[in-house]
Amino acid sequence: MSDENKSTPIVKASDITDKLKEDILTISKDALDKYQLERDIAGTVKKQLDVKYGNTWHVIVGKNFGSYVTHEKGHFVYFYIGPLAFLVFKTA
């Protein structure tokens, strides 16, 4: 695991319960430890959330992106781990 991956997540925006947020941060950190490619990290997080919390999760991981999304109430978090931004949300 690189030093960048050891960074504490920094939440920039959220509409989510603390329990769900902590679970998403843990799943994301684990995926970051396991994979190098952003699409693999995003895919792993999405699949785990779909299994654990039901379908229609969306996960975007990268260093430079814009977004404008609609999400299910209580199911949105935007955070950084090291240099990577994570946008995670669920739609109905």
UniProtKB/Swiss-Prot annotation:
Gene Ontology MF, one: dynein intermediate chain binding
Subcellular location, record wording: Cytoplasm, Cytoskeleton; Nucleus, Nuclear pore complex
Assembly notes: Homodimer. Cytoplasmic dynein consists of two catalytic heavy chains (HCs) and a number of non-catalytic subunits which present intermediate chains (ICs), light intermediate chains (LICs) and light chains (LCs). Component of the nuclear pore complex (NPC). NPC constitutes the exclusive means of nucleocytoplasmic transport. NPCs allow the passive diffusion of ions and small molecules and the active, nuclear transport receptor-mediated bidirectional transport of macromolecules such as proteins, RNAs, ribonucleoparticles (RNPs), and ribosomal subunits across the nuclear envelope.
Domain of life: Eukaryota
Family: Belongs to the dynein light chain family.
Family annotation (InterPro entries): DLC_sf, Dynein_light_1/2_CS, Dynein_light_chain_typ-1/2
Protein name per its UniProtKB record: Dynein light chain 1, cytoplasmic
CDD domains in alphabetical order: DLC-like_DYNLL1_DYNLL2
Keywords: Cytoplasm, Cytoskeleton, Dynein, Microtubule, Motor protein, mRNA transport, Nuclear pore complex, Nucleus, Protein transport, Translocation, Transport
GO biological process: establishment of mitotic spindle localization; establishment of mitotic spindle orientation; mRNA transport; nuclear migration along microtubule; nuclear pore complex assembly; nucleocytoplasmic transport; protein transport
Gene: DYN2
Main location as per UniProt: cytoplasm
Other comments on record: Present with 1310 molecules/cell in log phase SD medium.
CC per GO annotation: cytoplasm; cytoplasmic dynein complex; cytoplasmic microtubule; nuclear envelope; nuclear periphery; nuclear pore; peroxisomal importomer complex
